[in-house]
Amino acid sequence: MESVGDVLKDHPSRFQYQDLVQQIVKDPDVAAFIQKESLSQEELNRSISKFNQYITERDKFLRGDTDYIARGYKPILVMNHGYADVSYEETPELIAAEKEVAIKNRLRLINLPASLTKASLAQVELDDLGRLPVFEKFFTFVEQYPEVRKGLYLYGDFGVGKSFMVAALAHDLSEKRGVSSTLLHYPSFVIDVKNAIGDGNVKNLVDEIKQAEVLILDDIGAEQSTPWVRDEVLQVILQYRMQEDLPTFFTSNFNFEDLEKHFAKGKNGNDETWEARRVMERIRYLAEETRLEGENRR
């Protein structure tokens, strides 16, 4: 602990010393601390240098001085074995910033704009009443998770905000439930999987995605699908998530009927309706078909 002499070295006079001590103990924060802790005279005497240090650090903090080194922390007074000491606690601003970082760290976006990490259900504009049913379902899912497990298959016209809505859902799941979500642009994922065939990394890619705590497949149906992708990639992911009861969400420009037609297009124009229905059975099990109404917001 610093000596009073070191702190008051520029005040050699006894009268100056007493005057400075009086200034220190009359400081509103210091006076409140002395009263709260019921400091004895001996404890008070041992604490003068720390009180002085506290006042100096507090004033730097309040002024936002550039030489204040404990950025994001504010000085506070605490008791330390019979005398006052200076400690530091996180500011509300730092706590909020750290919370937001933690929220974003639980959001994994693959081939989607980073700006989607800023989406939240609180930002959803409900001036268009067509968005209200989807908002209510997402809000309910967040409130009731993990008891509720079935996801949503969100379809609608181009540009109505489907990706924003599912990103907002993921953000609120992270913020309010501490849940990690993987959001991936499905057409780009299909390309990545095809490119991984050469290096034998397909299984690792599929395993990583299928095990996500919450999985959101964005823009399904827009990919250049093949029977192999449909049966050996997508179906494997969906089957695993069915078995493990893992929440799964989708966005698409297609409704269920049109998506089935998309999957039924086989090699060389063959009709593979039966294979397509197998995939659709799993999607229907995992997610409720819901249309997002609204104007093109792009």
Residue positions per predicted region:
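Interdomain "pre-motor" coupling segment immediately N-terminal to P-loop NTPase/helicase cores
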Residues: 55-112
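N-terminal pre-Walker A segment at the start of P-loop NTPase domains
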Residues: 114-148
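Structural recognition of the conserved hydrophobic beta-strand(s) that form the central parallel beta-sheet
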Residues: 183, 216-218, 247-253
